[in-house]
């Protein structure tokens, strides 16, 4: 089974989590492709998306992921054959905590993509080891693939 991992990061935290999940999935025998800020044309044939994103500014997607989701929102393509999950990183100090993860989820569902498990929202204020925290969530993602 092939999994496309997309990361959007401003300070690198989401990128580190995405790379860690990529390594864990490969160790478990999955085929993966890891993209840091892809274009839609890079991933339009991928059927399983794991999106790992931080929240930037006033609840925005990071600059390296925003163009993809703008393009996706404006696309006429049917994404009903795409299954996805989202991992969001943010700070609960802000009222826009993990808004980028919410935007990713809403955009994909508006395009008929199928969410396969609950979104993981990591509060960077309370979780020191975000990579391990995300790894603990990974079995629910894998279960959703079945």
Swiss-Prot record:
Residues 3-142 form the Flavodoxin-like domain. Keywords: Electron transport, Flavoprotein, FMN, Transport. Its cofactor is FMN. The keyword Oxidoreductase does not apply. The keyword Flavoprotein applies. GO terms for molecular function: FMN binding. InterPro entries: Flavdoxin-like (IPR001094), Flavodoxin/NO_synth (IPR008254), Flavoprotein-like_sf (IPR029039). Probable electron transporter required for biotin synthase activity. Belongs to the flavodoxin family. MioC subfamily. This is Protein MioC homolog. It comes from Haemophilus influenzae (strain ATCC 51907 / DSM 11121 / KW20 / Rd). The gene is mioC.
């Amino acid at each position: 089974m092939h999994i496309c991992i997309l990361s959007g990061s401003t300070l690198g935290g989401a990128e580190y989590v995405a790379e860690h999940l990529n390594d864990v999935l490969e160790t478990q025998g999955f085929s993966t492709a890891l993209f840091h800020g892809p274009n839609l044309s890079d991933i339009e044939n991928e059927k399983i998306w794991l999106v790992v994103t931080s929240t930037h500014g006033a609840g925005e997607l990071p600059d390296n992921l925003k163009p993809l989701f703008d393009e996706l929102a404006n696309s006429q393509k049917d994404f009903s054959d795409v299954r996805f999950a989202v991992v969001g990183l943010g700070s609960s100090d802000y009222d826009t905590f993990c808004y980028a993860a919410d935007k990713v989820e809403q955009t994909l569902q508006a395009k008929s993509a199928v969410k396969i498990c609950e979104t993981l929202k990591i509060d960077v204020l309370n979780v020191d080891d975000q990579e391990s925290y995300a790894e603990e969530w990974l079995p629910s993602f894998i279960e959703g693939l079945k």
